[in-house]
Amino acid sequence: MVSEVREVTGRAIPLVGNDIDTDRIIPARYLKAITFDGLREGAFIDDRTALKGAHPFDQPQYQDANILIVNRNFGCGSSREHAPQALSKWGIQAVIGESFAEIFFGNCVAIGVPCVTADEAIVKQLQELVAANPQANVSINLETLQVQVGDFIAPISIGEGTRSTFITGAWDACGQLVANTEQVRVTAAKLPYVSWGKLAAS
């Protein structure tokens, strides 16, 4: 079955700062990994090491949070699909910020992690609300295009095509293949290069 993403709810991590690039999200040395499974430990590892426990990803009040609140131009720098994968392995299921680097945004879509935008003032208020109450419930609704933290509700944005991709589950290419197994078999049977061995034998 395809995985529709209509709403993401949970707790959030406020990560303040503009132009946080992919090398900070996951350093280049982690790109040697054969699979993405071990990338959790590398998420923001250099920043976390330098801050000696003061980084939001290390602070106890933000553990197990699944929404990331960032600022402007998040995910800029070199193109690496490992960056959203590292966030996903950490447990991040959605990101809200002022703006995102285009390739990072696309890589997030490919793994089912919506990146929604909001005005600078709204993002700042969201970060402050979560910092004041890390246990607050945060909801990102792709159907109503709203974010809610407690009594605070604000508009969010995401391209209509991308929004539709999440709501319908079209982002999930593997899920679509599984859901349409019979059609895949029928199509494959008609392809000459798939049945070449049978034709040669006959």
From Swiss-Prot:
The enzyme's E.C. designation: 4.2.1.33
Q: What is this protein called?
A: 3-isopropylmalate dehydratase small subunit
Q: Hey, which family's this protein in?
A: Belongs to the LeuD family. LeuD type 1 subfamily.
Signal sequence, renumbered to the chain: none
The job of this chain, per UniProt, is described as: Catalyzes the isomerization between 2-isopropylmalate and 3-isopropylmalate, via the formation of 2-isopropylmaleate.
Q: Which InterPro entries match?
A: 3-IsopropMal_deHydase_ssu (IPR004431), Aconitase/3IPM_dehydase_swvl (IPR015928), AconitaseA/IPMdHydase_ssu_swvl (IPR000573), IPMI_Swivel (IPR033940), LeuD (IPR050075)
**Gene Ontology molecular functions:** 3-isopropylmalate dehydratase activity
Q: Name one GO cellular component term.
A: 3-isopropylmalate dehydratase complex
Q: Which gene encodes it?
A: leuD
Per the UniProt record, the lineage of the source organism begins with:
Bacteria, Bacillati, Cyanobacteriota, Cyanophyceae, Nostocales
Catalytic reactions on record: (2R,3S)-3-isopropylmalate = (2S)-2-isopropylmalate
The subunit field of the Swiss-Prot or TrEMBL record says: Heterodimer of LeuC and LeuD.
Q: Which organism is it from?
A: Nostoc sp. (strain PCC 7120 / SAG 25.82 / UTEX 2576)
Q: What class of enzyme is it?
A: lyase
Coiled-coil parts of chain: none
* Pathway field: Amino-acid biosynthesis; L-leucine biosynthesis; L-leucine from 3-methyl-2-oxobutanoate: step 2/4
Q: Biological process GO annotation list? A: L-leucine biosynthetic process
Ordered alphabetically, the record's keywords are: Amino-acid biosynthesis, Branched-chain amino acid biosynthesis, Leucine biosynthesis, Lyase
